[in-house]
Amino acid sequence: MGKIVCLMGKSSSGKDTIFKELLQEGTLGLKTIVPYTTRPIRTGEIDGVDYHYTDESGFQQLLKSGKIIEERAYNTVHGLWRYFTVADESIQLEDNDYCMIGTLEAYVHIKEYFGEDKVLPVYIEIDDGERLQRALNRERSQTEPKYEEMCRRFLADCQDFSEEKIQAAGIKVRFENERLDSCLLRIVQYIQMNR
């Protein structure tokens, strides 16, 4: 197939859970593109698995070397946090299929870099009330909860994933994550049909 499945959706829509389930799903054989970030590691996250954690200096070195495919920067209440995708030796589309999590903006840049025929968008959505509750539950479980940042992210997602931006990115198929098992089944079928 040689495709990149790009999971997108607002924070706490279930992307991380679906991502992990897709990687474990036996018939798809997806590998992961691990993104990079300058934000602090969260409780339970693993460097090189969830993200490649770096600092601003590391980001600038990758930028100068021309390896950054796409990047987003967020002025958080804790400072500037960057998230970015790097063209490194781990991406071998001629040999493998991949799965990654990104924003609409990231999807557009990935599509431009690799070609539209190589990138399969999977947009996950959920009721905002449920999403806010999930975000709160996740933040409560952190050693040092960052509630102010959680609220900022929730509100920013309403703009970053506006209906106009979803349509402008060319997203035609959406997956409602009301129940994980049925949502996951629909996504697996969608990937299999679009190989």
Locations of regions flagged by a protein language model:
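Hydrophobic anchor at the beta1->P-loop junction of P-loop NTPases
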Residues: L7
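P-loop (Walker A) phosphate-binding loop of NTP-binding proteins
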Residues: K10
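ATP-binding Walker
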Residues: S13
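Walker A/P-loop
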Residues: D16
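Post-Walker A helix-loop "phosphate-sensing" segment adjacent to the P-loop in P-loop NTPases
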Residues: Q24-I33
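ATP-dependent small-molecule kinase phosphotransfer cores
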Residues: T37-Y98, G102-L104
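Conserved phosphate-donor/acceptor-positioning beta-strand/loop module used by diverse small-molecule
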Residues: D97-T103, F114-N137
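Small-molecule kinase domains that catalyze NTP-dependent phosphoryl transfer to phosphate-bearing small molecules
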Residues: R140-I191
